[in-house]
């Protein structure tokens, strides 16, 4: 089948969002030549891990995973742990500020006027972060350019700009703000919508577009299309459920344990917010909107209360308990595993 991209979109009357996904289906002839796209996601969660229950006991092929990494067991053959790569950054700022502010930059913080819990005050990072460096490299090459060079996702990141809330840097003194609101991220990915009701409408149109494409692709691509359609429907369902809840209507959605039935940015909604952001992240990768992303859960010194794990005390507070406190030790393992 020989068909130009422009004619394909015009004749089918599908949206740009659906077309962008369709262009990557091999049976339509526009996919890259057999070479898998390389993608990279950096994930941040605060307050460290319990080493004994995270790192393997010996080097080499992983025969088993420790308790914290156990959820990755179905993917164990693809898991690689890199121990001993230490980012020993000195300079201004306390350990928490340097812990996040230098994590992806590998360089010190500028002197500044932000005072941490100890040590000298500090400012932003002195250099670019590795995610933005890779973004720039990919965007320079027409074959690896994407609509968004990178995407910065957040979950419950405080609405303030300081050294504790930023880890991605476009350059010296240029922190990148993560987007914590999944609806705002949807707007970024799929266009500037006026309200949440329009989001559901856009997703509904996408579903129709994918059905138009279905008969034109191979059985293998049809499987990919079906998976993508299911993901779109899942996000659409969550948005419609939130709209129903805000208007007082009943919903049949199974609630996330111990969460209020809404999708507001609040502590108890963290599991649902994580899922919605991860769905959008997956969507952006499948659509090849980006190949580089950061996913930031709260912030340095993050003190979320993991009530869905039956933990009422703040995460950061628990992390300062000694290992001899068996209850706190166990709580940290559960938090790390989650």
Regions found by a protein language model. Give the residues of each.
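Ligand-binding pockets and gating/stacking loops
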Residues: 1-338
